[in-house]
Amino acid sequence: ATAYYHWDGGGCGVFFDRCGKIAVELEELRRRYPGLPVVLIGHSYGGSCAVEVARRQSVQAAPLCLLTIDAVARRQKSVRPACAEWWGNAYLRDGGGFMDAVPRIGGRWGHCAGADANLAFSGYSRDRKGRLYSHRRPAPMLYEPPGEEACSLFQAAASWLERNLPD
């Protein structure tokens, strides 16, 4: 099953978000299907919301993998949620140009000490399509590795999911 939520959970921005609503719905899903692993993905403020949603989850429910892509939020610390079995974090470490004002103002998390993997992308480097990595185009930070030596967040999450799917 797949569920998509607006970056603020359908609320009114960062001060009146609905991350709590998402957390309740996810907890219900995890309790209904206790052996089914969950992959929770968030980009920008959605990354911050994903961490908050994960923080509110029961540790005993279904296994949870957390992926954050260039997470942004000054009001929340990027502390590892207890229920996250695996946390992958990708972020833009530099560059980004003029259009990167939102994450700079909002407070880009960057490297998260509690994450199992931190993939740092340079805004001066180009993705496979030849475009500069940027906050407003998160897909390359999910599907591409930052260098030849690493795997992508998507590949890492797929491996985690494969290990956690019931027989």
Predicted features by range, described:
Residues A1-L36:
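Active-site catalytic motif of lipid deacylating hydrolases and related acyltransferases
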Residues G35-P37, A61-P63, A84:
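A general structural motif
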Residues I41-G46, A50:
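Gly/Ala-rich beta-loop-alpha elbow adjacent to hydrolase catalytic centers
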Residues E52-L64:
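Conserved hydrolase catalytic core segment
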Residues L67-D70, A90:
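Alpha/beta-hydrolase-fold catalytic nucleophile elbow
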Residues R80-D167:
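C-terminal catalytic-base region of ester-bond hydrolases, centering on the histidine
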